[in-house]
């Protein structure tokens, strides 16, 4: 048994743990009933561990928003210490623990979920499918990386070529995201996630904003948009006055449900010239916070930890199971 200390921290959750010879969850802000349910869930997992070298988890909770994040943290500890490959899979408002195509345990929210919702799976098996309302493979790749870590399968509009384009006629990020998610969900009968993301530059009064994708005109490309942005800021020499934020609004829509909305910002500055080969959109000209690094210099996993989209998806994952269960 290692002496390694594990830690996970974001704005909603903070866990510190280590492996011991017993199971213990303690701390602030966690209901006793939640702790008992998680302990009962994981006791079944612990029962399959090596009894000659017993391993248990000792986790202190500083802050906590949902069972999903806490269960994922503990399972990650168990996997690293025992070389197991247990997966945490959100499904129809529940949380499934699976390994090698076997279902090990199920966490149910308070009040349970309807059997019709739980067993309404596709021929591909358990696990929620998210249809991303975009044909942009770069954006889809980011979402696939993020959702894949949480057990979701991702499709995009390229899988549904018959669907019409949804005009983004809104004047806010939320209006546009709602238009896409709710329209496509109504047409397909599927759960749909749409994002409206953009770059807000303070010196330009928040532009390009909702017009980020077409900032340089009807035939806009990433290169043209970046060139126009740098031209607009050509006479702004002080980096502090070139402050900007990438913004994402995510909307999840499903038939007969109220839509779920989350938002996040990624602060930084606009560079004087592009740099980096990764990412897409305005990444080459966006300096990340005070780091001096351009977003296009980050590897995908680094960007997912920091970016507006990564932050928004993590917020979404925190509230998503309760949203599913409440409206199922």
Curated annotation (Swiss-Prot):
Q: Which Pfam families match?
A: Ham1p_like
> Is Hydrolase one of the keywords UniProt gives this record?
yes
Cofactor(s) the protein needs: Mg(2+)
Domain of life of the native organism: Bacteria
Enumerate the catalysed reactions: XTP + H2O = XMP + diphosphate + H(+); dITP + H2O = dIMP + diphosphate + H(+); ITP + H2O = IMP + diphosphate + H(+)
Provide the binding site for Mg(2+). Answer: 196
E.C. no: 3.6.1.66
UniProt keywords (A-Z) are:
Hydrolase, Magnesium, Metal-binding, Nucleotide metabolism, Nucleotide-binding
Q: Where does substrate bind?
A: 134-139, 197, 280-283, 303, 308-309
| Alphabetized HAMAP family for the sequence | Non_canon_purine_NTPase
Q: Which PANTHER family match?
A: INOSINE TRIPHOSPHATE PYROPHOSPHATASE (PTHR11067:SF9), INOSINE TRIPHOSPHATE PYROPHOSPHATASE/HAM1 PROTEIN (PTHR11067)
State the protein's purpose: Pyrophosphatase that catalyzes the hydrolysis of nucleoside triphosphates to their monophosphate derivatives, with a high preference for the non-canonical purine nucleotides XTP (xanthosine triphosphate), dITP (deoxyinosine triphosphate) and ITP. Seems to function as a house-cleaning enzyme that removes non-canonical purine nucleotides from the nucleotide pool, thus preventing their incorporation into DNA/RNA and avoiding chromosomal lesions.
Name of the protein in question: dITP/XTP pyrophosphatase
